[in-house]
């Protein structure tokens, strides 16, 4: 399974949305109905699943699904 699909599955499960809604352009708050606590819990789930650390200052810059995919791609092997 490709990285995007893995991330898509985690996001869909955490936010209780259909995976089809989780597109690279989908914004967590505006499009997927997440509140600030949902976003924090999602970041923690992604950190655990993919073995990356997403510092708060980076998490604040992650607005949509594409942002988180890029961050994990760039930092997963670091």
Curated annotation (Swiss-Prot):
It is found in: Cytoplasm. Pathway: Lipid metabolism; fatty acid biosynthesis. GO terms for cellular component: cytosol; membrane. The modification O-(pantetheine 4'-phosphoryl)serine is found at residue 36. GO terms for molecular function: acyl binding; acyl carrier activity; phosphopantetheine binding. Pfam families: PP-binding. SMART domains: PKS_PP. Its main location: cytoplasm. Signal peptide: none annotated. 4'-phosphopantetheine is transferred from CoA to a specific serine of apo-ACP by AcpS. This modification is essential for activity because fatty acids are bound in thioester linkage to the sulfhydryl of the prosthetic group. Residues 1-76 form the Carrier domain. Keywords: Cytoplasm, Fatty acid biosynthesis, Fatty acid metabolism, Lipid biosynthesis, Lipid metabolism, Phosphopantetheine, Phosphoprotein. GO terms for biological process: lipid A biosynthetic process. Belongs to the acyl carrier protein (ACP) family. NCBIfam families: acyl_carrier, PRK00982.1-2, PRK00982.1-4, PRK00982.1-5. Carrier of the growing fatty acid chain in fatty acid biosynthesis. This is Acyl carrier protein. It comes from Helicobacter pylori (strain G27). The lineage of its organism: Bacteria, Pseudomonadati, Campylobacterota, Epsilonproteobacteria, Campylobacterales.
């Amino acid at each position: 399974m490709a990285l995007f699909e893995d991330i898509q599955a985690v996001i869909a499960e955490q936010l209780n949305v259909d995976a089809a809604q989780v597109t690279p352009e989908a914004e967590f708050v505006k499009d997927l109905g997440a509140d600030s606590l949902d976003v924090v819990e999602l970041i923690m789930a992604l950190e655990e699943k993919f073995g990356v650390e997403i510092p708060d200052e980076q998490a604040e810059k992650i607005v949509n699904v594409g942002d988180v995919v890029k961050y994990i791609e760039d930092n997963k092997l670091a």
